[in-house]
Design a protein with these regions (language model features):
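Flexible, glycine-rich terminal cap/loop adjacent to redox cofactors
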Residues: 7-11, 15, 19-26, 34, ...
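Mid-to-C-terminal Rossmann-like scaffold of FAD/NAD(P)H-dependent oxidoreductases
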Residues: 2, 276-374
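Rossmann-like NAD(P)H-binding beta-loop-alpha module
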Residues: 130-179
């Protein structure tokens, strides 16, 4: 291959470019990125970056790939697959022999907050910095719309900074899709104890904007929450518009094979938030995965398989993994908690703040979650395979931390999400 183009200048794109060079690719390598910054790590933006535990330099990604043509501040707007060209927003055409699609995803409500003072999404360095500044300029009434991981992290940060904080979520239990019901119930208790006002089973109808500044949030029941600051954390949309009409399958994300080749082209691979890959634990369903560790795994495998070709390509085996700390509670999950409809505590006590939980869809275990028990999580991860049921999962005999209640060796399966 004389030229490989990587569309996406964030973690996945950077990782793919680095691996291509590390594996001996010596042709021309072009990286197209919509932001003007060199690639940086977005993971801490809603965490350590908000608390100033990490500065801009700490977001920089180490080990930059050598001899790369960086096209930063430019966006791909069209893919001519037959002609093997990527068309940029300035109408420049870049030919390729191999293509890495790593164009990521954007906040679902980015257009809603554009130009509105006091309304934010969390995606870029600038997003995090302006939101942080708004919290540091005095006591504020903060409304967080969306109770997923980012929403929960932001709400926890805001309330601990002394702000009147409300979190609005359409589900009956925020973060349940991310960590399963048992741990989500624990996090809800922590939110309430910290002073976060929870408006579950509630949707936002619109922002209340006056003279260009947000003044509140109008809910679906017609009530209004006054607000000086609003964070929209309602999920993301994959950046696939530039792939439409190319012949690739890109509805809801770029559809890839288990080797991360795009369905329909051996010259195209995908990595990161933008791709959908069939998962054996989910009977071949192909969800998008938006976690830091998965992005790195995708980037490494996609780059290697692009060079190897489809005949020698290896399938993706790495399971999604993520971790977070909310109100001091350390949580780590492996697998697909969002798919679960049953759960079982296999070790410890969620109420005591230390537990291992297995999550299943029907009988198939699809995820395992640790609450302050990360050292013991690998024993459960090794049991995540097709055919493993909740009844098959074996916990650990390691006792709880001194002073904790005695272990709860197992509990009944609980229906519901």
């Amino acid at each position: 291959m004389r030229r490989i183009v990587v569309v996406g200048g964030s973690l996945a794109g950077h990782g793919a470019a680095r691996v291509l060079r590390a594996q001996g690719y010596d042709g021309e390598l072009v990286v197209v990125g919509g932001e003007r910054h060199r690639p940086y790590d977005r993971y801490p933006l809603s965490k350590a970056y908000l608390t100033r535990s990490v500065d801009r330099a700490g977001l920089a990604i180490d080990d930059p790939p050598a001899d790369v043509v960086w096209r930063l501040g430019e966006r791909a707007v069209r893919l001519d697959l037959a002609g093997r060209q990527v068309v940029l927003d300035d109408r420049t055409r870049i030919g390729f022999d191999g293509l890495v699609v790593a164009s990521g995803a954007r906040p679902r409500d980015i257009d809603l907050v554009e130009g509105v003072q006091g309304a934010f999404v969390m995606r870029t360095i600038e997003d995090a910095e302006t939101f942080r500044s708004s919290l540091e300029s005095g006591t504020r009434r903060v409304v967080v719309v969306g109770g997923g991981l980012i929403g929960a992290e932001v709400a926890a940060h805001a309330v601990h900074q002394g702000h009147h904080t409300t979190m609005v979520d359409p589900s009956d239990l925020p973060t349940a899709r991310a960590v399963g019901r048992p741990v989500a119930e624990h996090l809800q208790r922590l939110h309430e104890a910290a002073g976060v006002h929870l408006r579950n089973r509630t949707r936002m109808r619109t922002l209340d904007v006056r003279a260009g500044s947000v003044t509140g949030v109008v809910l679906d029941d017609g009530s209004r929450l006054p607000a000086d600051v609003v964070m929209m954390a309602t999920g993301t949309t994959p950046n696939v518009e530039w792939l439409r009409g190319s012949g690739l399958h890109a509805s809801g994300g770029l559809a890839c094979t288990p080797t991360l080749h795009a369905r329909g082209s051996d010259r195209v691979v995908g990595a990161g938030d933008v791709v959908r890959v069939p998962q054996p634990l989910l009977d071949g369903e192909a969800p998008r995965v938006e976690h830091w560790a998965s992005t790195l795994a995708h980037a490494e495998l996609a780059a290697a398989n692009l060079l190897a070709g489809p005949e020698r390509a290896r399938p993706l085996t790495a399971l999604p993994t993520f971790g977070t700390t909310i109100h001091g509670a350390r949580v780590r999950a492996v697998g697909f908690p969002q798919a679960a409809d049953r759960s079982r505590v296999v070790w410890g006590s969620v109420e005591a703040g230390q537990a291992l939980v297995a999550l299943a869809r029907g009988r198939q275990v699809v995820a395992v979650v640790s609450l302050a028990a990360h050292d013991h999580l690998p024993s459960l991860v090794g049991q995540l395979s097709p055919g493993t049921s909740l009844d098959d999962v074996i916990g650990t005999d390691v006792p709880l931390t001194s002073g904790q209640p005695s272990p709860k060796r197992s509990g009944p399966a609980v229906a519901g999400r």
